[in-house]
């Protein structure tokens, strides 16, 4: 199975990366905006991907063709979301919609993970 996960530089993404060696029969692609800042990618490959950029998402997904997408990328700090409402909307709403739309095009299953604060 091929598994792509977003938010690789965040807490959840780092935990997934660390766990990938336990699932060596699966291929993993870790994604986040910009450079990889995760110290331990485990067995995952890394691709820079901005979830607000539909074309970039399509490009990454068409190359990797994941069966499952674990979507954990988000703006998670409540105070920052309040201060930067438009950015929070772009990342947490539009970015999520972009991921779902792109997943639908390649028939990938989406697991969306969030918090009760967002």
Regions found by a protein language model. Give the residues of each.
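SDR active-site strand-loop-helix element
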Residues: 6, 31, 69-73, 110-115
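Residues at the starts of beta-strands that form the adenosine-phosphate
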Residues: 2, 27-28, 109
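N-terminal Rossmann NAD(P)H-binding glycine-rich loop of SDR-like oxidoreductase domains
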Residues: 1-23
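Helix C-cap/helix->beta junction micro-motif
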Residues: 24, 64, 105-106
């Amino acid at each position: 199975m091929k598994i792509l996960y977003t938010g690789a530089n965040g807490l959840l993404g780092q935990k997934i990366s660390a766990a990938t060696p336990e699932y060596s029969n699966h291929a993993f692609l870790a994604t986040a905006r910009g450079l990889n800042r995760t110290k331990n990618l485990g067995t995952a490959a890394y691709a820079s991907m901005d979830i607000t950029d539909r074309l970039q998402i399509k490009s990454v997904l068409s190359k990797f063709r994941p069966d499952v997408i674990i979507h954990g990328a988000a703006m998670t700090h409540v105070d920052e979301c309040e201060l930067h409402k438009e950015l929070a909307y772009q990342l947490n709403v539009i970015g999520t919609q972009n991921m779902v739309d792109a997943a639908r095009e390649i028939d990938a299953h989406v697991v969306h993970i969030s918090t009760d604060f967002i």
